[in-house]
């Protein structure tokens, strides 16, 4: 029996795939639970159209992320903070601070969790901070911390 998967099914396949399953598995599990429908010509055509639309949307998002990555690579964020002895900061510069400054300076909205700052910055200097925009698309952002 050929079925079109509506959801990801563990050990079987991903949503949108057409799979050949035993009749009992299809009738007793996949169809009643709503995990799949019978693979008719119209269902297959609709699934192909959905997959094509998803691919187009993903490609557009990837192009947008690559353009943003190029823009981030050219940016330099400068933080002016109070410092104590040996150029140590009072406080620190965190990934949330970098995200807020990025929005303030360049109007770019990035989730703080995508900024790959391992530990908060606690000293003055120049830092290269990785930013993971999406899977496979990343950039580095130059952050300069100077004392008052």
UniProtKB/Swiss-Prot annotation:
GO terms for cellular component: cytosolic large ribosomal subunit. Disulfide bonds: none annotated. GO terms for biological process: translation. Keywords: Ribonucleoprotein, Ribosomal protein, RNA-binding, rRNA-binding. GO terms for molecular function: rRNA binding; structural constituent of ribosome. Gene3D superfamilies: Ribosomal protein L9, C-terminal domain, Ribosomal protein L9, N-terminal domain. The keyword Glycosyltransferase does not apply. Binds to the 23S rRNA. Belongs to the bacterial ribosomal protein bL9 family. NCBIfam families: L9. This is Large ribosomal subunit protein bL9. It comes from Chloroflexus aurantiacus (strain ATCC 29366 / DSM 635 / J-10-fl). The lineage of its organism: Bacteria, Bacillati, Chloroflexota, Chloroflexia, Chloroflexales.
């Amino acid at each position: 029996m050929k079925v079109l998967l509506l959801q990801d099914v563990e050990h079987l396949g991903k949503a949108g795939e057409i799979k050949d399953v035993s009749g009992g598995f299809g009738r007793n599990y996949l169809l009643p639970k709503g995990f799949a429908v019978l693979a008719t010509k119209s269902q297959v055509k609709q699934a192909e159209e959905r997959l094509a639309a998803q691919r187009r949307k993903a490609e557009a998002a990837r192009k947008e992320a690559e353009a943003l990555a190029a823009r981030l690579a050219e940016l330099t964020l400068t933080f002016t903070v109070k410092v104590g002895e040996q150029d140590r900061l009072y406080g620190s510069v965190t990934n949330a601070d970098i995200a807020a400054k990025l929005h303030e300076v360049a109007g770019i909205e990035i989730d703080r969790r995508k900024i790959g700052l391992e530990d908060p910055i606690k000293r003055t200097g120049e830092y290269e901070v990785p930013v993971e925009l999406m899977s496979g698309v990343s950039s580095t952002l130059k952050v300069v911390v100077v004392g008052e």
